[in-house]
Amino acid sequence: MSGRTLVAGVGNVFLRDDAFGVEVVRLLAERPVPDGVQVKDFGIRGVHLAYDLLDGCDLFVLVDAAQRGETPGTVTVLEVEVPEPDPDAGPVIDAHSLTPDGIFALLGSLGGRPGRSLLVACEPADVSAGMGLSGPVREALPHAVRTVQEILTGETVSA
């Protein structure tokens, strides 16, 4: 492994709460992070993210909005397993929407294997066309930033 940690924010800033990951990494970029940590905004460039991960990392933290049936604004940390390549599977890339599952599937199909992968997800309230986060998701930003900082410093967050 490379000894690096990658924190990647993904999402579409033109689909309201889908911009959650982008906003979290924007706020994180204003704060100090431990040595070896890269904080990047990948926006809707999930394919670029998958290729970046092929360089290897010990810890990968993906920050994104994800509909999980929770109350809007709920922040959840999940441990994610990168799937093994499936030669019989169809295409894993949807040019219009690359979900967290799609990013991990693409990474697996390319043979990428981060040491540990976490998803810091926020339940969206509104992913309609428009700019700006909904109230519940905007209010969740400080908690999400603290959560990622705790992950990076090895504090009490567990997946």
What are these regions (language model features)?
Residues 148:
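Hydrophobic "lid"/C-terminal helical patch
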Residues 1-114, 119-122, 131-142, 151-159:
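N-terminal catalytic or cofactor-binding beta/alpha core of small enzyme domains
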Residues 124-126:
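Short, internal active-site loops enriched in acidic
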